[in-house]
């Protein structure tokens, strides 16, 4: 099955061979299968909370990616994202979460950081709404920004964030912004139109909430009102490899 724009962008953002990649995207295994092909030295872990879905993913993997050694390159789990057994698997980790709201994603990440306080791991995130809340949480965790960009699929616009959670509490070299920075640095007309539409959607959303008496929304509306869309040579802001 062909990947959509959003999953394709996620695959393209995995530019190094992690020892372990966790597909927590509620995507029927499509992303993880693409990463199995692209990163032959990585172990890909497929995670879903719904038993019937993970059973189907397991059968598909057995069919298309049969084990050739005693150590298969993929594993499947029926569990909550909060319960990922990161420390049971030595090496570098990338956790990919998409297809859920930024509020729920925030809960997942906070719990993962709490349960693995001495372990660095990367996160590749594509939330549905509530990105400001998610960014607040990532900033509180002292997350290191690697890249951020906008991607449009089926007339919906998503933020794609690649960050690293580090165990140290020292100064962060590339901290996140609450409203994004390189999201608004565009290199062509199409990107400019997407950025303008997305910014307008956010401004209108928080303006409506602020008019309803939401003090937090008033602050967010003002923050997005201050955003400027700028022309840039590179709109992905690849900071750290």
What are these regions (language model features)?
Residues 18-27:
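Conserved class I S-adenosyl-L-methionine
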Residues 27, 100-103:
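Short glycine-rich anion-binding loops that position phosphate/pyrophosphate groups of nucleotides
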Residues 52-89:
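S-adenosyl-L-methionine
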Residues 36-37:
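Gly/Ala-rich phosphate-binding loop of Rossmann-like dinucleotide-binding domains
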Residues 29, 33:
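Glycine-rich SAM-binding Motif I of class I
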Residues 2-9, 84-85, 93-94, 103-241:
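Class I S-adenosyl-L-methionine
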